[in-house]
A protein has these predicted regions:
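Extracellular glycan-modifying ectodomains
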Residues: 1-281
Length: 281
């Protein structure tokens, strides 16, 4: 419970820093695969704390005025159409990533429209490939008992590029003075190219998106690193999309690379913001 409260204070502190720079925060809370597909859990059920994580984070965001659409409700409506998550992995499929990107784009268009002319992007499907996900790596069967492993998923990768240029033509823009209106920060849900979440966001938003997402770091560390970057200080975006899987809320991040005084100040600012939000209710 103490890690949940500390992480919520950090989230509120991040919001305060973004507000100071005129950046709108869109919190994309990714529901756990087990929450979306409880019918496959069998007799094992999550504990009480895990059962309430998604709603706790969503309610905290709403209480503090953070834009955070209910992605769980949207995905529950979509799950009958196609697989939203890989069978052998905790991550989403390219289709699931696309549906989330489209829902986020509708939220942006309704609540925080982007400035400037929209850009056009196109997404193409690449050749399918077998994919054994991270859930399989938890099973100590390979190589001696590999015949007992479940069959791999058939992943259909997608690639998105701007219609203004060919997919590989980025050399001219590399040294151009371009301010990206949208920044994406998050985890492997955003960073891994197999899901094409970044590309799906670009197409759905009609805007280029600069990604600072990282795999294997959780959602908090990439965000804190971005807040300390020259890119944020010198050229803050109009909108920042923070992809945040619910399962990280109770986890204690390793903050040893950051100045403890800075972290303490972020959490203090977050606590103050929470008190103000509570008084306003």
């Amino acid at each position: 419970m103490q890690h949940i409260e500390a992480n919520l204070r950090l989230i509120r502190g991040v919001q305060q820093r973004l507000d100071e720079h005129g950046v709108k925060l869109l919190l994309a809370i990714i529901p756990a695969k087990a929450r979306l597909y409880p019918e496959h859990l069998g007799e094992e059920r999550p504990g009480r704390q895990q059962r309430g994580l998604y709603r706790q984070l969503h309610d905290a965001a709403h209480c503090n005025g953070i834009l955070a659409p209910d992605l769980l409700a949207n995905l529950q409506q979509e799950k009958a159409r196609d697989a939203l998550f890989l069978r052998t992995d905790t991550h989403w499929t390219p289709y699931g990533a696309e549906r989330v990107a489209q829902h986020l784009a509708r939220t942006v268009q309704r609540d925080s429209p982007l400035a400037g002319e929209p850009q056009r992007f196109v997404t193409e499907q690449a050749a399918g490939k077998p994919y054994l996900g991270d859930l399989v790596r938890f099973l100590p069967l390979d190589p001696l008992f590999s015949s007992l492993l479940p069959p791999p998923d058939q992943l259909q990768p997608r690639r998105t590029h701007s219609l203004a240029s060919s997919p590989g033509d980025g050399a001219a823009a590399l040294f151009a003075d371009i301010r990206f209106p949208v920044v994406l920060v998050g985890t492997s849900y955003s960073a891994a190219p197999d899901w094409n979440f970044l590309g799906a966001l670009r197409q759905a938003l009609g805007s280029d998106v600069l990604s600072y997402a990282e795999s294997g770091q959780g959602p908090l560390l990439p965000m804190l690193k971005y807040l300390q970057s020259d890119a944020f200080k010198d050229s803050p975006p109009q909108l920042l999309i923070w992809e945040f899987p619910e399962r990280y809320l109770p986890m204690a991040p390793d903050l040893s690379q950051f100045d403890p005084a800075w972290i303490d100040q972020l959490q203090a600012d977050g606590a103050a913001a929470q008190r103000l939000a509570t008084q306003a209710e």
